[in-house]
């Protein structure tokens, strides 16, 4: 049975001229493999406005699965996120100058939401293709976590049939020419996100395997 998968990526932020999350996601717009039929939308790196754009994308596409994607400069792996927390704590301003500190994303909402994606299975499938991947247990407190939490809150309140989650990706090589940081090719990132979409479309349940962090 076909599953429509909505992928979102952000516009550039923090002085960057490119955001690999959108560069990879837009490559997959219209792609189909197995039961996964992929559509892509860009969201702004702006608190609350990103959620408004996401809600409109949900209305437009009526997806079965939503995977939001964001850049995590400094990471060297594809990292599906385990948990979103109800906190905006911005170290830098967003693209419209907003810099909330100690603010709830959803007043009265739960402290956190778990992902709705089979993230351990996604990690294993990505690693089978020789692409580095690992489960992450923190999505930060900037717009990525904001969108992740907002997505799961929206699903919980209004779209219980949708499964959703968030994946962080590294820089691409062109972003690291003037700084020392790990990167991954755009081809590898795009391939990994396609694997994630197909895996989520095929499997609702995750695998039982060891993981976690010691600190």
UniProtKB/Swiss-Prot annotation:
GO terms under cellular component: cytosol
GO BP annotations, alphabetical order: proteolysis
Record has Cytoplasm as a keyword: yes
pH dependence: Optimum pH is 6.5. Stable from pH 7.0 to 9.0.
Reaction equations catalysed: Release of an N-terminal pyroglutamyl group from a polypeptide, the second amino acid generally not being Pro
Entries under InterPro entries matching the protein: Peptidase_C15, Peptidase_C15-like, Peptidase_C15-like_sf, PGP-I_bact-type, PGPEP1_Cys_AS, PGPEP1_Glu_AS
Molecular function as annotated in GO: pyroglutamyl-peptidase activity
Keyword presence, Transmembrane: no
Main location: cytoplasm
E.C. code: 3.4.19.3
First-tier enzyme category under EC: hydrolase
Active site: 81, 144, 168
Coiled coil (UniProt feature): none
Keywords recorded for this protein, A-Z: Cytoplasm, Hydrolase, Protease, Thiol protease
UniProt family annotation: Belongs to the peptidase C15 family.
Quaternary structure, from the entry: Homotetramer.
Family annotation (NCBIfam families): PRK13197.1, pyro_pdase
Protein name as catalogued: Pyrrolidone-carboxylate peptidase
Organism (species): Bacillus amyloliquefaciens (Bacillus velezensis)
Lineage, highest ranks first: Bacteria, Bacillati, Bacillota, Bacilli, Bacillales
């Amino acid at each position: 049975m076909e599953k429509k998968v909505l992928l979102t990526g952000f516009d550039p932020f923090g002085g960057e001229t490119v955001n690999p999350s959108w560069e990879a996601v837009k490559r997959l717009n219209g792609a189909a493999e197995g039961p996964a039929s992929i559509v892509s939308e860009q969201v702004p790196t702006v608190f609350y406005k990103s959620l408004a754009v996401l809600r409109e994308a949900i209305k437009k596409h009526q997806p079965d699965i939503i995977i939001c994607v964001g850049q995590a400069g400094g990471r060297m792996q594809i990292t599906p996120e385990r948990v979103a927390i109800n906190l905006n704590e911005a170290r830098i301003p967003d693209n419209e100058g907003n810099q909330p500190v100690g603010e709830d994303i959803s007043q009265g909402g739960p402290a956190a939401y778990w992902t709705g994606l089979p993230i351990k299975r996604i990690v294993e499938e990505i690693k089978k293709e020789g692409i580095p991947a690992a489960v992450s247990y923190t999505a930060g407190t900037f717009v990525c976590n904001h969108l992740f939490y907002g997505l799961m809150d929206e699903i919980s309140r209004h779209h219980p049939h949708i499964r959703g989650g968030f994946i962080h990706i590294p820089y691409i090589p062109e972003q690291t020419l003037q700084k020392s940081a790990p990167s991954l090719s755009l081809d590898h990132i795009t391939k990994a996100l396609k694997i994630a979409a197909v895996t989520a479309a095929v499997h609702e349940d995750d695998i039982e395997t060891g993981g976690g962090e010691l600190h």
